[in-house]
């Protein structure tokens, strides 16, 4: 699936596999090129992160987390993310400034946490396929999943003919959804739940 994500010459292919989950990624490495290989782990390797994007305020967050006792082994913004999740859980999202789509797997309870930035600059899609949860930044990667049977989503066509736009979370492919901007997703015990964490306010 990750092979379908073709990027520039600077893109690096990363992967993680266990008996419960497989995670693949292609990323543009621009910070701490040698140490920034993914996946990124927390101290006891109970959390595994795959991350696409950039956290603008990662240095400030890193300092705060170090003061809280977290140990860092790289200068990357991705390592800041995993320690932030370990420290603050879902609440860490409101501390972030940047563009991002990331997934964190808990190796102890088997759960998967996925989040997308406030404004949806970085894409994220997901599907339940024959009892398995599949996610990717681009739909074409999910289409490569062997058990997914490509099927047109007529509901999306109705939206498009009415608005010239597919109303999210629907996509043109049946069973494939986009994670909305400013939302996070939990996959636990075979169930998917999505929650809005950010809503713009105007004063």
Language-model region placement:
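Positively charged, low-complexity/disordered segments
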Residues: 1-9
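Cysteine-centered catalytic environments shared across enzyme families
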Residues: 8-9, 13-203
